[in-house]
UniProtKB/Swiss-Prot annotation:
Entry EC no(s): 5.3.1.9
Catalyzed reaction equations: alpha-D-glucose 6-phosphate = beta-D-fructose 6-phosphate
Organism of provenance: Beijerinckia indica subsp. indica (strain ATCC 9039 / DSM 1715 / NCIMB 8712)
Keyword Cytoplasm in annotation: yes
PROSITE patterns: P_GLUCOSE_ISOMERASE_1, P_GLUCOSE_ISOMERASE_2, P_GLUCOSE_ISOMERASE_3
Family stated for the protein in its record: Belongs to the GPI family.
First-tier enzyme category under EC: isomerase
Alphabetized InterPro entries for the sequence: G6P_Isomerase, G6P_Isomerase_C, Phosphoglucose_isomerase_CS, SIS_dom_sf, SIS_PGI_1, SIS_PGI_2
Domain of life: Bacteria
GO cellular component: cytosol
The name this protein goes by in its record: Glucose-6-phosphate isomerase
GO molecular function: carbohydrate derivative binding; glucose-6-phosphate isomerase activity; monosaccharide binding
Location relative to the cell: Cytoplasm
Length: 547
């Protein structure tokens, strides 16, 4: 990385941005073939970035920025198994988890693929046995309900994928996900469960995660109370590496599945953490999911920057975050089953790049991760789209939509697609004051009424968006979409010069919670040393306990 060259390119981009006068609509008028020139079609996903406020000059400067930052070299290091997670001295080789050909992948000189393939086969064998009923509940019946207990990457990924791929889930299985230490999460789930035919998957690499183990212990108590202590071994399995703790919990050793330190939590759905996904959709469909991720790995690793979708996605983010100072990005899938996708991306993007320190330990020189948020269309249109169209903050948007439905009524889907395309069009084009006045006059309003109402009905337009279009949402397509965002995040981290694979920001709160827990449990514990606000709040909590 050449930081001087990076700074120089950022300065050139700033000058270019200040000189930019054209609206997005202007760019379409200048170039009638803009869509053809500003979209990339992969095997199953079309990425349309024509509705962005960028020209060829903009993109050339952004590609120069990527090269100055060393994106190509760092990409090679990533795939070569270098310790790109510098604060924890680890590689980030989640790509190996979705590699299907078994070709060597090295981590510190060791080929990890034999272990990856062996663990994958172990997961597949167990999952298929659960699906077919050859592994049974304690009463000899087939399992009907699967509960994944985890938090963070051990919940967000599996929950999102299973929800998104609902049409592919086995009819005889009902999937549940529990993450929050709030007892209502597990309690409400337990009320719905036929415990006699329920399998619990406990996902915690260390088998010490506070939220996960609290929920797991409560679930264990429920099983032991209703079905007997001996049933615990039949109704629990684990994704962890701590065999001694798992044995003490009562889980059989052949029902334990592991993964490696080079798999970050937010990249772990491809690993044994995805066991609930494999049980839900089956090994064959899960391989299609892995194939989708592998498709994008190959594209990202080999495509020139100028035609590399994750690179362009990242550069657009940099352009808006650092040159236009847009602080948020919305992700709007026009697919109800994708309603957890934006939450999944929140962790992937904000935990990875929500950093203020460079690799060297010096403060960053540019703004880093935006706030990522969103809801499915068309629901969002009746909630926050008012702000997107007419608010004072400009929010770049990612739209995701399938050309064909997955088992839904065609009439419904046609309306869904029309709304998706209409929103991106309206955000780009807007509606001028002159056009509004013409429309109101045509509706019969007098001049005074027109002049009063017209300003309220103006749409500024020039609001940027990307559209991801695919035939229908399948395991392979979902794998492609996830991997596109994973590699986007990596490229951004290289340019911002941060470690995208650690998450020290989650530690302080956990540390303080551990100190406060005994104080909250013991009403006589001293509040000495606490700040005034925290002490005051605990005092009020103690009053409520007495009441």
């Amino acid at each position: 990385m050449n930081r001087d060259e990076v700074a120089k390119t950022f300065a050139a981009l700033k000058a270019h941005r200040e000189a930019s006068q054209e609206t997005i609509a202007d760019l379409f008028r200048v170039d009638p073939n803009r869509f053809e020139n500003f979209h990339i079609k992969l095997d199953d996903v079309l990425f349309d970035y024509s509705k962005h406020r960028v020209t060829r000059t903009t993109l050339d400067l952004l590609f120069a920025l990527a090269r100055a930052a060393g994106v190509e070299d760092r990409r090679s290091q990533l795939f070569d198994g270098a310790a790109v997670n510098i604060t924890e001295h680890r590689p980030a080789l989640h790509m190996a988890l979705r590699k299907l050909d078994g070709a060597p992948v090295l981590a510190e000189g060791k080929d990890v693929m034999p272990e990856v393939l062996a663990e994958r086969q172990k997961i597949f064998t167990f999952a298929e046995a659960i699906r077919k009923g050859t592994i049974k509940a304690a009463n000899g019946e087939r399992f009907t309900d699967i509960v994944n207990i985890g938090i963070g990457g051990s919940d967000l990924g599996p929950r999102m994928v299973v929800t998104a791929l609902a049409p592919f889930v086995a009819d005889h299985l009902t999937m549940h996900f529990v993450s929050n230490v709030d007892g209502a999460d597990l309690g409400d789930t337990l009320k719905k469960l036929p415990l006699a035919t329920t399998l619990f998957i406990v996902c915690s690499k260390t088998f010490t995660t506070l939220e996960t183990m609290t929920n797991a212990q409560t679930a264990r108590e429920a099983v032991a109370e209703k079905l007997g202590e001996a049933a615990v071994a039949d109704h629990f399995c684990a994704v962890s590496t701590q065999l001694d703790k798992i044995a003490a919990f009562g889980i059989k050793s052949d029902r334990v599945f592991g993964f490696w330190d080079w798999v970050g939590g937010r990249y772990s759905v491809w690993s044994a953490i995805g066991l609930s996904v494999v049980i839900a959709i089956g090994a064959e469909k899960f391989e299609k999911f892995l194939l989708g991720g592998q498709d994008i790995d190959q594209h990202f690793q080999t495509a020139p920057l100028e035609s590399n979708v994750p690179v362009i996605m990242a550069l657009l983010e940099i352009w808006y975050r650092d040159l236009w100072d847009y602080a948020t990005r919305a992700v709007i899938p026009y697919d109800e089953r994708m309603h957890r996708f934006s939450a999944y991306l929140q962790q992937l993007e904000m935990e990875s790049n929500g950093k203020s320190v460079q690799l060297s330990g010096a403060p960053v020189t540019e703004s880093t991760s935006p706030v990522v948020w969103g809801e499915p269309g068309t629901n969002g249109q009746h909630a926050f789209f008012q702000m997107l169209h007419q608010g004072t903050e400009i929010v770049p948007i990612d739209f995701l939509v399938a050309a064909q439905p997955s088992g839904a009524d065609a009439k419904h889907h046609q309306l869904l697609v029309a709304n998706c395309l209409a929103q991106s069009q309206a955000l780009m084009q807007g509606r001028s004051l002159e056009d509004v006045k013409t429309l109101l006059t045509a509706q019969g309003l007098d001049t005074a009424a027109v002049n009063t109402l017209a300003p309220h009905k103006v749409f500024p337009g020039n609001r940027p968006s990307s559209t991801f279009l695919y035939k229908r949402l399948s395991p392979r397509v979902l794998g492609q979409l996830i991997a596109l965002y994973e590699h986007k995040v990596f490229v951004e981290g290289v340019i911002w010069n941060v470690d995208s694979f650690d998450q020290w920001g989650v530690e302080l709160g956990k540390e303080l919670a551990n100190k406060l827990t005994p104080i909250i449990r013991d009403s006589e514990a001293s509040l000495e040393g606490l700040d005034g606000s925290t002490a005051g709040l605990i005092g009020e909590i103690r009053k409520h306990k007495k009441g």
